[in-house]
Design a protein with these regions (language model features):
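Pyridoxal 5′-phosphate
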Residues: 1-191
Length: 191
């Protein structure tokens, strides 16, 4: 809902929104994205990782596809942070959003990366803090807690990837023993 709910709101405001159908394994391909892009497309927004099916999108490839069509690219990297390497610059993101609680940080804290010179209108008006991009008093404790949580998550990332991969492989093996049960998403063991 983090990406879909704002998309629905934009539709209610009169914007045209296209949804890309993922392939049977939950991945959005550049070809599928290209099929829904139109000359008037201004923004592409993709979840970097899906916590329900486990797919990690080819974010850099999707960003290149969006940029080639003249659109800005945003990723919701909340589910990816601390689980897979995240580098918004290498990915080519114009914007990326994160939430602290997914890496053990304080609830209510988050971060929005916006690439320098990316067009951006403030959603909160007032005192003009953050170069006019976000007014209001900053949650310093929340930001510090988020920073600490990211550091811990990055230090434990390789172990967490191995742990989650082992759990997934164990689940797939147990399900494979059940007659008539088959996974709806195919993931290579150890990935």
């Amino acid at each position: 809902d983090a990406v879909l709910a704002p998309a629905k709101r934009l539709e209610q405001m009169g914007f045209s929104v296209a949804r890309v159908q993922p392939d049977r394994n939950g991945f959005i391909t550049a070809a599928a994205l290209e099929q829904v892009m139109r000359p008037e497309t201004v923004l592409v927004s993709v979840m970097a990782a899906n916590s329900e099916v486990g797919s990690v999108q080819p974010v850099a490839e999707l960003a290149r596809t969006a940029h080639a069509a003249g659109a800005l690219f945003h990723t919701d990297a909340t589910q990816a942070l601390g689980k897979v390497p995240v580098n918004v610059v290498d990915w080519g993101c114009d914007a990326a959003s994160f939430s602290a609680h997914k890496v053990g940080g304080p609830k209510g804290a988050g971060a929005l990366y916006v690439k320098n010179r990316t067009p951006f209108d403030a959603c909160m008006l007032g005192g003009g803090q953050e170069a006019g991009r976000r007014s209001g008093t900053q949650n310093v404790c929340g930001a510090a807690g988020f920073a600490a949580a990211i550091q811990v998550a990055q230090e434990k990332q390789a172990d967490e990837q191995a742990r989650l991969g082992a759990l997934r492989d164990k689940l797939y093996a147990a399900l494979a023993e059940k007659p008539g049960v088959r996974p709806t998403v195919q993931v290579a063991p150890g990935s």
